[in-house]
Amino acid sequence: MRLTKRDYEVLSLLNRCRYATTKQLVELYFRENKPKTATRRANLLTKKLLNLGLIHHLERRVGGVRAGSGSYIWFITHKGIKELRKIDPSIKLRLKNRYEPTRNHLKHQLFVTQIFVELKILDADEKMLLENFSFEPKCWRSFATLFSHFTLKPDAFARLTIGNFEDAYFFEADNATEHLGRVVAKCKQYIAYYNTGIEQRENCIFPMIVWIVPDEKRKMALETRIREDLDAYWELFSVITLDEFSNFIQGGQDD
């Protein structure tokens, strides 16, 4: 069976983001259709790729079994990656994962995928131009200090243009599962990287570091710790909820 351009787009997405729900595929590729039609078209596409052995879904579902086929969580198979390599030999093969991801890991990965979805929707609606979006590990940054070598591991990186302005972001998807002390420690890694000047020399600007959190309670707690523990460096960071994300990206949120 011949693959379409959209088939390859879905395979490429799953190779980059690791996991995506049917709903997220609908939002990315079928927004021009009415909801029922969009879901049906997404189901047909995933069924085709599933039957070809190029993708598969986890046993668990978003919303449980009663949510139907629209609740599946999809991932690319080894065969799917090999298919992608036919058009892009630079893509690396990965070892098969024998086990399903933990609940927290999966929730985190889908959160990062949703950040990408939100940006693509803004791009499609011509609210901004998404120049680049990198998932892990492509968004990682390696650097050295006087004492050691480090790898900064953002959850994602994005570069976008709004009007005549170019913005860049490191994103951290926070599900309120990490102790605040570990979050602050991650912030200090960003500060260490900022102080190397590497990003500024290569790209002229240092990306805004955005922590995206599930609710206002977590937002207030994280903002307070950042201001208390990071001295003047707190200005490198913003903390928002996912509901605030679209408005924030468009410049509608105060610092």
Model regions and ranges:
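Nuclease-adjacent, charged terminal/linker segments that flank catalytic cores
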Residues: 1-100
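Flexible, glycine- and charge-enriched loops at secondary-structure boundaries
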Residues: 4, 35, 39, 105, ...
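Hydrophobic, Leu/Ile/Phe/Ala-enriched alpha-helical segments that form helix-helix packing faces
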Residues: 29, 46-50, 115-123, 190-198, ...
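Amphipathic alpha-helical dimerization/coiled-coil segments
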Residues: 82-132
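Active-site metal-binding core of divalent-cation-utilizing nuclease and nuclease-like domains
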Residues: 118, 128-169, 178-185
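C-terminal regulatory/effector modules of DNA-binding transcriptional regulators
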Residues: 156-255
